[in-house]
Design a protein with these regions (language model features):
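Hydrophobic membrane-insertion alpha-helices, especially the h-region
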Residues: 2-17
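Long, low-complexity, Ser/Thr/Gly/Pro-rich intrinsically disordered segments that act as flexible linkers
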Residues: 19-126, 130, 143
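Short, low-complexity cationic-aromatic patches
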Residues: 29-32, 90-99, 138-150, 235-239, ...
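One face of beta-strands
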Residues: 37-39, 103-105, 229-231, 239-247, ...
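Short hydrophobic-aromatic micro-motifs
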Residues: 37-41, 103, 144-157, 303
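An internal, short helix-loop-strand segment that often contains or flanks glycine-aspartate motifs
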Residues: 46-82, 125-239, 254-255, 268, ...
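C-terminal soluble interaction/assembly domains
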Residues: 253-308, 314, 320-323, 346-348
Length: 351
């Protein structure tokens, strides 16, 4: 009898663990440290929808070209998933706050070749729990990198080495479904199923709008966010690429004001003729911006849009989209008078 009870308990525990894990955030996200914002990108479906990684780029930065030559790893082709933890800095003695990042990258790479390359760049290699941590100087900071498995790497430019050590500790416990940053544990259930790009972020009160790239909000809209609000943004493919941004505020009044402000921006955007690379109006870009809508749901503002696949492909494969009035024909500039003409004019006046 006790054997039967033990089997039932063990089976129940396994089923519970499987169910919890199936509802947990992706593995890459669960390895991240505590942070102010989390950003996740799944590149595998993006490659199916676009030409990303299918054609070698015409030009590469020489430093990146050398990285590819020595490691055999191309981000466009070989990176499958990426998770980023964003750590907002604090201004000290008049110096502006510096945002730091920790990341988990999953893909296909040769551990031996990548390890040899990192060792050449590192000023120090620390051994921690059977893993090498490479300390690499980059722009007056130290970037620490660790190869966690045959398809997973961790990196962080946070000052404390404890951050990447904690990521290694999390990797050791990756089978458990309860790990991950508090933001993810609390709000990941709000991310729509099948999202290929999503972020959960608390906007920094000290950062400028242009420094809030992790919020996935267009243009300067992130500058309108109420203090201490929270943003959940996501994109997932159906007939089009669906975008959704939930801005969670502290009150219905805050949500109403933000909704009205964004609504004003939407009216302005929809009144413009959208052009791509100065080539005239683009129907896919226009369709994307025409689909933008915002509404209030109690203490939240909800922004939605549907992006045509054609526009999605343009974003990843063509020059940047220019948002603004369509280019107008310019009148030719008047030609300057020649010295001979000036002398003739002077003589006629003298007569």
């Amino acid at each position: 009898m006790w054997v039967a009870v033990a089997i039932v308990v063990i089976a129940g525990g396994i089923v519970t663990a499987v169910l919890l894990r199936s509802r947990a955030a992706p593995d890459a996200v669960r390895l991240l440290p505590e942070s102010d914002a989390v950003l996740y990108v799944n590149l595998e479906p993006i490659r199916l929808l676009t030409d990303l990684g299918k054609k070698p780029p015409k030009e590469r930065d020489p430093q990146y070209e050398e990285f590819v030559r020595q490691t055999g790893f191309e981000f466009e082709r070989d990176l499958d998933k990426a998770a980023f933890a964003i750590h907002y800095g604090v201004a000290v003695k008049g110096k502006p706050a510096e945002t730091r990042y920790s990341e988990i990258l999953q893909g296909h790479f040769d551990s031996a070749r990548v390890g040899d390359y990192l060792r050449k760049l590192a000023t120090q290699v620390e051994r921690y729990r059977d893993y090498d941590i490479y300390d690499i100087p980059v722009e007056e900071r130290t970037v620490r990198v660790a190869l966690l498995g045959f398809d997973t790497a961790a990196a962080s430019n946070v000052d404390s080495p404890e951050v990447i050590r904690g990521m290694i500790d999390s990797y050791k416990q990756a089978a458990l479904p309860f790990t991950g940053p508090a933001l993810v544990s609390q709000y990941y259930r709000r991310v729509p199923l099948g999202s290929i790009v999503w972020t959960i972020a608390r906007p920094s009160a000290n950062s400028a709008a242009q420094d809030r790239g992790e919020l996935l909000l267009p243009g300067s809209w992130s500058g309108l966010l109420p203090r201490a609000s929270l943003v959940i943004a996501s994109a997932w493919p159906l007939n089009d690429v669906h975008l959704r941004v939930n801005v969670i505020t502290h009150s219905a009044d805050e949500a109403r004001r933000f909704t009205e402000q964004v609504g004003t921006y939407l009216m302005l955007f929809k009144s413009l003729e959208i052009s791509v690379d100065a080539g005239g109006p683009d129907k896919d870009v226009k369709a994307a911006f025409d689909s933008l809508e915002v509404h209030q749901d109690k203490s939240e503002a909800v922004l939605t849009a549907k992006v045509p696949y054609a526009f999605f492909k343009k974003v990843l494969s063509e020059p940047p989209v220019e948002l603004g009035p369509a280019p107008q024909k310019q009148e030719p500039a008047p030609q300057p008078e020649t010295p001979t003409a000036k002398r003739k004019t002077s003589k006629s006046k003298a007569k």
